[in-house]
């Protein structure tokens, strides 16, 4: 690479020994060898990249020539590989089309099933009479109809107010607050440490 002979290496070694001394010479040699390795690696990478670029250019030129000749004068091996590639591409396309058809068929079936289920639920809800839905306990109005019949002079707002005051309905949703309202004297307070 540098075209250095054995005698020139010995001369460089003696000069390095005199200048650097025996302690620093091995470290300097290791450093120089590391630089040489790095330079050789870079040169090899550049050579490989140039070779790949040349191959790529040759391939592109051969493709252009083949396009100009319309693939009629290609060698039998190249025409055979081109036909194989076309067949494999057609096979892959047909497989994809078949898979697409199956998927669309399955999704159409599932959509039809869901629509049938929705229609059946709508029919079931239509057959259930609204009066029976209103009679369930959750759907009962808050207004007490018995109390409204006893006092017909009360307005609906007053009837609703009385219904809110009814503890039997109120206790169904909330626990009684009596236990929390009064403080328990069971815990004696220590007032001696307050200053």
Curated annotation (Swiss-Prot):
Which biological process terms from the Gene Ontology are attached to this UniProt entry?
protein transport by the Tat complex
Q: Which residues cross the membrane?
A: 1-21
The residue ranges flagged as biased composition, category Polar residues, are: 183-195
Q: Which Gene3D superfamilies match?
A: 1.20.5.3310
Q: Where in the cell is it found?
A: Cell inner membrane
Give the way it sits in the membrane.
Single-pass membrane protein
Q: Which GO terms describe its cellular component?
A: TAT protein transport complex
Please tell me where this protein is predominantly located. Answer: membrane
Output the InterPro entries linked to this UniProt entry: TatB
Keywords of this entry = Cell inner membrane, Cell membrane, Membrane, Protein transport, Translocation, Transmembrane, Transmembrane helix, Transport
Q: One MF term from GO for this chain?
A: protein transmembrane transporter activity
Chain residue ranges for the region called Disordered: 166-195
User: Could you tell me which PANTHER family the record lists for this protein?
Assistant: SEC-INDEPENDENT PROTEIN TRANSLOCASE PROTEIN TATA, CHLOROPLASTIC (PTHR33162:SF1)
Q: Which family does it belong to?
A: Belongs to the TatB family.
What is known about its subunit structure? Answer: The Tat system comprises two distinct complexes: a TatABC complex, containing multiple copies of TatA, TatB and TatC subunits, and a separate TatA complex, containing only TatA subunits. Substrates initially bind to the TatABC complex, which probably triggers association of the separate TatA complex to form the active translocon.
Q: What does this protein do?
A: Part of the twin-arginine translocation (Tat) system that transports large folded proteins containing a characteristic twin-arginine motif in their signal peptide across membranes. Together with TatC, TatB is part of a receptor directly interacting with Tat signal peptides. TatB may form an oligomeric binding site that transiently accommodates folded Tat precursor proteins before their translocation.
Q: Report what the protein is called.
A: Sec-independent protein translocase protein TatB
Gene name in the database record: tatB
């Amino acid at each position: 690479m540098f075209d250095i002979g054995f005698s020139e290496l010995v001369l460089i070694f003696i000069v390095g020994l005199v200048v650097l001394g025996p302690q620093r010479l091995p470290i300097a040699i290791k450093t120089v060898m590391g630089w040489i390795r790095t330079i050789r690696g870079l040169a090899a990478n550049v050579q490989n990249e140039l070779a790949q670029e040349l191959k790529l250019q040759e391939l592109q030129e051969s493709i252009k020539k083949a396009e100009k000749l319309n693939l009629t004068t290609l060698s039998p091996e190249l025409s055979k590989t081109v036909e194989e590639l076309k067949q494999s591409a057609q096979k892959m396309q047909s497989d994809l089309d078949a898979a697409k058809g199956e998927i669309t068929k399955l999704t159409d079936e599932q959509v039809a099933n869901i629509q049938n289920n929705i229609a059946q639920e709508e029919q079931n809800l239509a057959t259930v009479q609204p009066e029976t839905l209103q009679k369930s306990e959750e759907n009962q109005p808050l207004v007490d109809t018995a109390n409204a019949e006893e006092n017909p002079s009360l307005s609906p707002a007053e009837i609703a107010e009385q219904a809110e005051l009814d503890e039997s309905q109120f206790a169904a949703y909330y626990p009684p607050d009596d236990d929390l309202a009064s403080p328990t004297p069971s815990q004696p307070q220590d007032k001696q440490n307050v200053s």
